[in-house]
């Protein structure tokens, strides 16, 4: 599943082709995504794209008339192609530009989304209650300490809660907790400030490194040019249950937390 780094890599890849371009057409071949593509999505046609930014895992394409909201879901990707590029089986949506380029949305599992919103985008129900971005100053140890006070839920589940902080999905939550030496099942409210300082730092560093490396390639993700990411080569725990810990050699344990695979080292990560 594309997480924050993958969506940010996609944004960086498509932005130069979209900004200041007039939209000349929107072709919807299959409207049956996670939510049906609304007819209102056609309102972007004739508009000039002013900016392309990201909020959590949502890609936001801004015009004067409104914003197209794109979510990659479990297996979605965006590529910039030409009019001569053959349409493939799961190419559900084309956004055509005056330059002759096309922003093409491919989603084999159809858990992604393509929506339209005319009001200020922060008011959209999908975005209005989101927590801070992890790579901004708003996500800091003091904020996290206050947010976790009294919480008995496992720290890993809190780290993946978009109301607390956005975009820290399963891959990066596993990796950050390993780097910080924190057991994923530890009660969130019992993690002291000293450990939270380390955890916040590791979250920021791991996400920034993943973006720099072009995202993590696990099954479906490719960037806007169709190339894979390379951060998977640097994973210490995710997907490595039963293998040796890269720090101590102990066998890594794998459990389910919130129905998600959770891998950790019982020696290096403590409660």
From Swiss-Prot:
Keyword annotations of the record: DNA damage, DNA repair, DNA-binding, Glycosidase, Hydrolase, Lyase, Metal-binding, Multifunctional enzyme, Zinc, Zinc-finger
Binding, DNA: 90, 109, 151
InterPro entries in alphabetical order: DNA_glyclase/AP_lyase_DNA-bd (IPR015886), DNA_glyclase_Znf_dom_DNA_BS (IPR015887), Formamido-pyr_DNA_Glyclase (IPR020629), FPG_cat (IPR012319), MutM-like_N-ter (IPR035937), Ribosomal_uS13-like_H2TH (IPR010979), Znf_DNA_glyclase/AP_lyase (IPR000214), Znf_FPG/IleRS (IPR010663)
Note accompanying the cofactor annotation: Binds 1 zinc ion per subunit.
Disulphide bridges: none
Keyword Lipoprotein applies: no
Catalytic activity: Hydrolysis of DNA containing ring-opened 7-methylguanine residues, releasing 2,6-diamino-4-hydroxy-5-(N-methyl)formamidopyrimidine; 2'-deoxyribonucleotide-(2'-deoxyribose 5'-phosphate)-2'-deoxyribonucleotide-DNA = a 3'-end 2'-deoxyribonucleotide-(2,3-dehydro-2,3-deoxyribose 5'-phosphate)-DNA + a 5'-end 5'-phospho-2'-deoxyribonucleoside-DNA + H(+)
Residues at the catalytic site: 2-3, 57, 260
Annotated CDD domains: EcFpg-like_N
Cofactor: Zn(2+)
Zn-finger (FPG-type) residues: 236-270
Enzyme Commission numbers on file: 3.2.2.23, 4.2.99.18
Highest taxon above the source species: Bacteria
Gene Ontology annotations of biological process type: base-excision repair
GO terms, molecular function: 8-oxo-7,8-dihydroguanine DNA N-glycosylase activity; class I DNA-(apurinic or apyrimidinic site) endonuclease activity; damaged DNA binding; zinc ion binding
Record-stated family: Belongs to the FPG family.
Quaternary structure and partners: Monomer.
Function: Involved in base excision repair of DNA damaged by oxidation or by mutagenic agents. Acts as a DNA glycosylase that recognizes and removes damaged bases. Has a preference for oxidized purines, such as 7,8-dihydro-8-oxoguanine (8-oxoG). Has AP (apurinic/apyrimidinic) lyase activity and introduces nicks in the DNA strand. Cleaves the DNA backbone by beta-delta elimination to generate a single-strand break at the site of the removed base with both 3'- and 5'-phosphates.
HAMAP family in the record: Fapy_DNA_glycosyl
Name of the protein in question: Formamidopyrimidine-DNA glycosylase
The species this protein was found in: Shewanella woodyi (strain ATCC 51908 / MS32)
């Amino acid at each position: 599943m594309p997480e924050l780094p993958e969506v940010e890599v996609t944004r960086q890849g498509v932005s130069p082709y979209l900004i200041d371009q007039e939209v000349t057409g929107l072709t919807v071949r299959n409207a049956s995504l996670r939510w049906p593509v609304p007819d209102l999505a056609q309102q972007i046609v004739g508009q000039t794209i002013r900016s392309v930014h990201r909020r959590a895992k949502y890609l936001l394409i801004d015009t004067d008339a409104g914003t197209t909201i794109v979510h990659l879901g479990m297996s979605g990707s965006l590529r910039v192609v030409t009019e001569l590029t053959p349409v493939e089986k799961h190419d559900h949506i084309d956004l055509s530009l005056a330059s002759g380029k096309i922003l093409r949305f491919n989603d084999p599992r159809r858990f992604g989304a393509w929506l339209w919103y005319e009001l200020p985008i922060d008011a959209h129900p999908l975005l209005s209650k989101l927590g801070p971005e992890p790579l901004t100053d708003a996500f800091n140890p003091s904020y996290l300490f206050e947010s976790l006070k009294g919480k008995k839920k496992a720290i890993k589940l809190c780290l993946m809660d978009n109301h607390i902080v956005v975009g820290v999905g399963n891959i990066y939550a596993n990796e950050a907790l390993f780097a910080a030496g924190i057991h994923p099942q530890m009660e969130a409210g019992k993690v002291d400030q000293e450990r939270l300082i380390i955890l916040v730092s590791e979250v920021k560093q791991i996400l920034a490194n993943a973006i720099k490396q072009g995202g993590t390639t696990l099954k479906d993700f490719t960037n806007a040019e169709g190339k894979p990411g390379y951060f998977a080569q640097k994973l210490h725990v995710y997907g490595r249950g039963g293998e040796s810990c890269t720090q101590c050699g102990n066998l890594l344990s794998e459990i389910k937390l919130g129905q998600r695979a959770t891998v950790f080292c019982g020696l290096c990560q403590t409660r």
